[in-house]
Amino acid sequence: MDKKLARIRRATRTRQKIKELGTTRLVINRTSRHIYAQIISPTGSEVLVAASSVEKVINQEFKYSGNKEAAAFVGKIIAERALKKGIIKVSFDRSGFQYHGRVQALADNAREAGLNF
């Protein structure tokens, strides 16, 4: 089993468990250059809030958007946008990525900004 397939299998298991809980989920996707975060409804049919390092606000702030500092800023922005919409409690879906580095920075700053997970 290769690395990508193993990550996808972990992500599928996590999503299934979160679906059983029936809560909104904070989904992370990571590429080598950017990081994306979305808060998805319990049914999975609509994106309630989104933020990514591709956005102009973040792109102008950082020289390179594929680092921990940019991920931390995305975490802060996603939490602020969620709180404006009245979303406080979410389940963290790291999409099979290891809880380390950019994923951890995003999660920690989202918690500091007021999201509970």
From Swiss-Prot:
Alphabetized InterPro entries for the sequence: Ribosomal_uL18_bac-type (IPR004389), Ribosomal_uL18_bac/euk (IPR005484)
GO molecular function annotations of the record: 5S rRNA binding; structural constituent of ribosome
One GO term of the biological process aspect: translation
A matching Pfam family: Ribosomal_L18p
Gene Ontology CC terms, in alphabetical order: cytosolic large ribosomal subunit
UniProt keyword annotation of rRNA-binding present: yes
Record carries keyword RNA-binding: yes
Keywords: Ribonucleoprotein, Ribosomal protein, RNA-binding, rRNA-binding
Superkingdom of this protein's organism: Bacteria
Function: This is one of the proteins that bind and probably mediate the attachment of the 5S RNA into the large ribosomal subunit, where it forms part of the central protuberance.
Assembly notes: Part of the 50S ribosomal subunit; part of the 5S rRNA/L5/L18/L25 subcomplex. Contacts the 5S and 23S rRNAs.
Family: Belongs to the universal ribosomal protein uL18 family.
Protein name: Large ribosomal subunit protein uL18
Species name: Hamiltonella defensa subsp. Acyrthosiphon pisum (strain 5AT)
Originating gene: rplR
